Amino acid sequence: MAEPEESREPRGIRLQKVLSQAGIASRRAAEKMIVDGRVEVDGHVVTELGTRVDPQVAVVRVDGARVVLDESLVYLALNKPRGMHSTMSDDRGRPCIGDLIERKVRGTKKLFHVGRLDADTEGLMLLTNDGELAHRLMHPSHEVPKTYLATVTGSVPRGLGRTLRAGIELDDGPAFVDDFAVVDAIPGKTLVRVTLHEGRNRIVRRLLAAAGFPVEALVRTDIGAVSLGKQRPGSVRALRSNEIGQLYQAVGL
């Protein structure tokens, strides 16, 4: 015998509760977002507070940025120290990021690392078990920008930024920067900020060396919307909801 309609449990979870649990906003603030038309479910703007969704299958966006609802997904920012290899394991016994995070994060074998760095370069790397996001972030077609602070030998001339934006021919083809700025200078050394979206091996070091300014120290500070901030070398933190959403947006997810 069929169960009476009025006695059936409503399917799904209230949308404002889902947003609150995802860390987007408090329940009350989430309700206002819905009423204001800032929330989409599966491509449609939702303004009804009684809307229920299944977090396992629904695609929810706030202000156009996707909200991650799958609690099994992990998104981390690591400040890789200098001298450590960008691998989860190393068969030669060299220090690697897998050694660093296994003490802090469970399930490290399932994590993909995004934004590989040379052993002698420090700075921001992303770690996630979201394979689709990791793949897209690493694919050059999505052109996710990465920013570095480089200490170079010598005094940088005023026109170097223009030269780097125009492009320099390297052994494996031309390379360009998206942005370049001098941050600080002392006699014999200059600190510069470089932003580019490609990820060829040692591209920043090779590009600056080809321009006549060998790199003495290099730190990656940003990948897309995620910034290193005040993270200490060796530290790991969970990405904030807005950071994850902006990464999704950057790669068209």
Where are these regions (language model features)?
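Basic, flexible Lys/Arg- and Gly-enriched helix-loop patches that mediate nucleic-acid binding at interfaces
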Residues: 2-253
